[in-house]
């Protein structure tokens, strides 16, 4: 990391705070090859573009403002898995600006957001965005993480912040180095947005996955024609 002049002081400080994690430090501090100890998500595929057959099913929104960025991600269903595409990762965004980013997209799907910001959700809804808060409760974070872990996940190459956070999203450890069942806050923002976006989502039954809405409508029309003929 010392050879990368593009890193901000905040990222450098975050890296150096993890010197006490040998596995992580060996990979990201000293540049050795290997797997990061305590990494929450693994084996995500980085893809150059979203397949034409992929279907946009949700958007995830994690609120931030001054210290933490606001993150918006598109989530596509494709061939039994999900594809993540980063729309925004920026500090200082107002609710109006968040709504404008979402409404600038041609496709309109449900936005799932952090329910800790009910006033922001109401305001963004008032700007014409289909948005709702994610229900939270005991164990909901761990359940959401497990749901994502169980899926085949891909992320677009242009989603540079999401990829960086995916690679650095770790479980907390205690003073003895024991891994705990709680994620670190550092690098969590895009991961939270993804978890919110997939909250409560299930693949539609009897619906062919990995095909576009246009193709799905063609299939439905052909079935109808066969029925009436």
Question: In which residue ranges do the predicted regions lie?
Answer:
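Short, structured patches in soluble enzyme cores that scaffold and shape functional sites
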Residues: 1-3, 19, 31, 74-76, ...
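ATPase catalytic-site recognition across NTP-hydrolyzing enzymes
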Residues: 4-64
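Non-catalytic, well-ordered alpha-helical scaffold segments
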Residues: 23, 69, 188-191
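Short, well-ordered loop/turn elements at secondary-structure boundaries
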Residues: 53-55, 66-69, 105-107, 149
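A conserved active-site cap/scaffold subdomain adjacent to cofactor or substrate pockets
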Residues: 56-61, 65-73, 85
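Mg2+-dependent endonuclease catalytic cores in nucleic-acid-processing enzymes, primarily RNase H-like
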Residues: 73-74, 78-186, 204-213, 217-218, ...
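Stable alpha-helical structural segments in soluble proteins, enriched in small hydrophobic residues
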Residues: 189-201
